[in-house]
């Protein structure tokens, strides 16, 4: 989780933050009777506290996709996040956007198989090629669950709000190049990777 403050442009103060979610997904293997197995999963972990940056975005949890044989596909996941901003008393408008940065999971073996994760915000696809508007007070977009930010962007204190993206597996390959149309043809195993979403906040004076 990182926060980066960009320089001023005219009278606009623009800040971006990148929310990084580590993702694991896998296909299950049926076990025969009287066979036992044990596995140990280890997570690398860090802890961070940041209550001073102009914009802080924190993912609230991780993502885990499971293959379901009955639908020949993977389940979708709701990924919650927390947004905190510092108010600017000189601001007359506020805008918050998001953009997909990375979304590829790679299988943890020699197959090279990949899965791509799609990100959706309130019915709008979060893409790499353009910004998804989450708040735009100048045009009456007040952010739904993020509305406390639309109301507090020009306050003298910090304001927080929580919302979520919907994550789903939208495409895959068997070897990194050959696309699959039927997920049941994917190799067995576990895919791992990061889904990164960049948030940009602009205070206009």
Swiss-Prot record:
It is found in: Fimbrium. The keyword Signal applies. Keywords: Fimbrium, Signal. It comes from the Bacteria. It holds the Pfam family MatB. Residues 1-32 form the signal peptide. One of its GO terms (cellular component) is pilus. Disulfide bonds: none annotated. Induction: Negatively regulated by H-NS. Positively regulated by IHF and EcpR. Self-associates. Forms filaments. Interacts with EcpD. Part of the ecpRABCDE operon, which encodes the E.coli common pilus (ECP). ECP is found in both commensal and pathogenic strains and plays a dual role in early-stage biofilm development and host cell recognition. Major subunit of the fimbria. Belongs to the EcpA/MatB fimbrillin family. This is Common pilus major fimbrillin subunit EcpA. The gene is ecpA.
